[in-house]
């Protein structure tokens, strides 16, 4: 069975009050249209066609290369939109039509829709739900056997039909051959002058084909996002789902209301997440980690047993059983090994720091390779920029960099090299050598008294 998705994403979304197309607004770090694409793939869809219109190039930039694009230059209704993808619909396909602004649809729901459609040998199946207040929605009218008779829009419903609580979700499953034939018979003979996809069900039924409705979803899951208020609601629901999913899988989240975890983040079991944490992008957190209050980690990998304390980590890697923070900043391309300590107010950028090394306080380590078991004292600066170019420094295994020292790149400190406190190092340091690069202390006895006398005389 070849499942293919057609995603309707051509609309402008004027109620969003945005210069950007509606479907690329993000929910928990991912564009709405990409949520739909990912969920459809997980449900078994092999190929995806996205119908674009308004600001098509902007949307296309956010889509993976394998996504098929079909254009709807004029927005003439949902049926017209699907017509634009007709060349990609094969007779043997099972087609699911989805809306690009419904990011909360679940993989399990689509799988059940497919199963229901196939088991009942329907040519078209609409996904439905029942609500307490159906006002504004298209009503599902079933025949005596429970099959779909028709879909009646709110404005066309009579008083009896308005009492029906089962509503149309806007998500459909079709037999490919039947859909192609029905699209050819669509017309726009209605008050809006549009081609409605819902009319395909009636066309199929009039031809004697079996069509159905699957009441297998919830109004929350089917919520469309048309405004910033609805975007916020979708974000809240998605965030709750994500947090609950991690907790079910063995992660402790102290305060779910203040914890923000994006949809592609992965976390190992027995990790504890404290309040105020933000985990974004493709971040991977290992098992038995502690992610402390107000830490922000983006597109980074954290090894098992590591503790992050109130720190910011971006596009970096931290090994196992290491500690970072409090108030540390790992900028892009920081790569820390196992059992590494990066302490308070230490900044690391584009640097490798190997196993067992530590920089406990107030240091800047940029464009560097630090070996194993190196001690970097308080106030050490890797001076990497001459105003035009950046250079790299290398500190090899078991070296000791004394407090308040400057390593002026490019410079190499060989194994067991020892830098005296307060030194400014501009030349390589040999293996096992002590480097002292500072003025010798001078004591001038009685200097203060002489200075005071001179100051008094000048008054």
UniProtKB/Swiss-Prot annotation:
One of its GO terms (biological process) is UDP-N-acetylglucosamine biosynthetic process. One of its GO terms (cellular component) is membrane. Binds 1 Mg(2+) ion per subunit. Keywords: Acyltransferase, Cell shape, Cell wall biogenesis/degradation, Cytoplasm, Magnesium, Metal-binding, Multifunctional enzyme, Nucleotidyltransferase, Peptidoglycan synthesis, Repeat, Transferase. It holds the Pfam family NTP_transferase. Its main location: cytoplasm. Its EC number is 2.7.7.23, 2.3.1.157. Mg(2+) binds at residues 101, 226. The active site is at 361 (proton acceptor). Coiled coil: none annotated. Homotrimer. Catalyzes the last two sequential reactions in the de novo biosynthetic pathway for UDP-N-acetylglucosamine (UDP-GlcNAc). The C-terminal domain catalyzes the transfer of acetyl group from acetyl coenzyme A to glucosamine-1-phosphate (GlcN-1-P) to produce N-acetylglucosamine-1-phosphate (GlcNAc-1-P), which is converted into UDP-GlcNAc by the transfer of uridine 5-monophosphate (from uridine 5-triphosphate), a reaction catalyzed by the N-terminal domain. This is Bifunctional protein GlmU. It comes from Clostridioides difficile (strain 630).
